[in-house]
Regions:
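Chalcogenol-based redox active-site neighborhoods
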Residues: 20-182
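Positively charged n-region of N-terminal signal peptides that target proteins for export
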Residues: 1-6
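Bacterial N-terminal signal peptides
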Residues: 8-19
Length: 182
């Protein structure tokens, strides 16, 4: 009885801690907030502009907590492995983080992370994450792990929010592929 009650309490606590991230994201059908931000591709600085990227096709904006952290390393590596599949669909991938932004130049070029295959943007003060309702509840100055697929008209067509990095690439690639068949 005590064990059952303890497990139920732990389950409730887990739901309260982790569920808000999935609920907080902007909804499918909403207009994606426009942004520009300092970014890095293969260690080279540039300014990423969502409006410019959308002129080329759909954009995957994936928010991640911080460079050089275990889950974020995995997620970046998975995106780098799949980047050719995104490019085949004329999609741009941009990672956005408010955490450890001073490490993004290295993170963007390291082969075990982004491998120079896609850009990552610095979100100083989490201003972009706030617009996208993608703040990490447990550490409000950092981005949550939430991925958006935005069609070329600027409309959000897919949202996936989960602290585990493992399904973000599959979820976003499936959504981008579905756009191509429309």
């Amino acid at each position: 009885m005590i064990l059952t009650r303890s497990l139920a309490t732990l389950g409730l606590i887990g739901t309260l801690v982790f569920a808000p991230a999935a609920i907080a994201a902007l909804k499918v059908g909403a207009k994606a907030p426009d942004f520009s931000a300092p970014a890095y591709l293969a260690g080279e600085p540039f300014t990423f502009k969502l409006a410019d990227a959308l002129k080329k096709g759909p954009v995957v904006v994936y928010f991640f907590p911080a460079a050089h952290t275990s889950g974020c390393n995995v997620e970046a590596h998975l995106f780098s492995e799949a980047i050719d599949k995104f490019k085949a669909q004329h999609a741009t991938v941009i990672g956005v983080t408010a955490g450890k932004t001073d490490e993004l130049a290295d993170f963007s070029k390291e082969t075990e992370h982004c491998g120079g295959k896609f850009a990552v943007a610095a979100d100083a003060g989490a201003r972009i994450a706030k617009k996208y309702d993608a703040l990490l509840k447990l550490k409000p100055g950092w981005s949550d792990r939430t991925s958006y697929v935005i069609d070329s008209s600027g409309k959000i067509v897919h949202v996936y929010s989960a602290l585990s990095p493992n399904q973000h690439v599959k979820e976003t690639l499936d959504a981008v592929s579905a756009l191509a068949t429309k």
